[in-house]
Amino acid sequence: MTLRIGVIGTGAIGRDHMRRINQTLSGAKVTAVSDVNIESVRTARADLAPEAEVVGSGEEVAASAGVDAVVVTSWGATHEQYVLAAIAAGKPVFCEKPLSTTAAGAGRIVEAETAFGRRLVQVGFMRRYDAGYRMLKAVVENEIGRPLMVHAAHRNPSVPEQYITPMAIQDTLIHEIDVLRWLLDDDYVSAQVISPRRTRHAHARVEDPQIVLLETKSGIRIDVEIFVNCRYGYDIQCQVVGEEGLASLPDPMAVVMRKDAKLQSAIMTDWKDRFIDSYDLELQDFIKAAARGTASGPTAWDGYVAAVSSDACVEAQSRPGSIVPISLPARPPLYN
């Protein structure tokens, strides 16, 4: 049986997922699309899913009899309403991050899914599907003893004028917030943000670089450098220091060239290229689970924890040097 998917939001990532579903992955096809920009949705349909129905709203996509599962790739502030609509319709839903722009909104999704009684939500934290992170997790769990510290970095070549300081947490660090929690199997208890010397390449509305300091329940200390105007490329680094050794995230495979008295290899500049395989794997995982009427991968609870942690980090940005506590309620049994 081919899973019929409705896509809500036909911007860049929505179009990417439509292409994946119809041209790269197996077991599914796009049968309905919706976007507030009618020209965007018509173009996406014509280019990528000519047999799909153009539907008037995201809620109508979720309720459609011609849709078995939903993919939400709309503007972040609308994610909550569309995920809740999918849950109300009893349909599996893949939601790009953030699950909600607020912790309260993510909490409402957790409550709705818990009341439904079965997992339906997968959140688009694709780094969990990256081969490098999976290799690193295996080493952390089996080879280097108890983790003590983590040193990480998230660097972008540049960001546009509309990228402002809180987005360094909400759009950038959010990936580290999730993947490091998964890597260490440990929740956060506090956050602190400090700002080193400011780069001259940052525009007026963004503080750059920033260093985020996190502590986990077991006492692991994490420092994450966020540098979104590093100029030289898109660079993700992660090193875990354990009692018996340390382990580092491998860099993407690249040819090493010796030429003109130089030893060099290329560094990627586009985040989509860095994690392209992960996007394919996470969506194929969703299709496989949705065909059984459920969801796998990162949960609504993971999305909620990320939102709570993100809110604490944003608060810490506004109180430089202050340590902000991170408090979570008990995890619902559905997510154990």
Swiss-Prot record:
InterPro entries documented for this protein: Gfo-Idh-MocA_inositol_DH, Gfo/Idh/MocA-like_OxRdtase_C, Gfo/Idh/MocA-like_OxRdtase_N, MI/DCI_dehydrogenase, NAD(P)-bd_dom_sf
Pfam families named in the record: GFO_IDH_MocA, GFO_IDH_MocA_C
Membrane spanning stretches: none
Assigned keywords, A-Z: NAD, Oxidoreductase
Any one Gene Ontology BP term: inositol catabolic process
Ranges in coiled-coil conformation: none
Enzyme class: oxidoreductase
Molecular functions per Gene Ontology: inositol 2-dehydrogenase (NAD+) activity; nucleotide binding
Assigned EC number: 1.1.1.18
PANTHER family linked: INOSITOL 2-DEHYDROGENASE, PTHR43593
Subunit comment: Homotetramer.
Family assignment from sequence similarity: Belongs to the Gfo/Idh/MocA family.
Protein task: Involved in the oxidation of myo-inositol (MI) to 2-keto-myo-inositol (2KMI or 2-inosose).
Protein known as: Inositol 2-dehydrogenase
Organism per entry: Acidiphilium cryptum (strain JF-5)
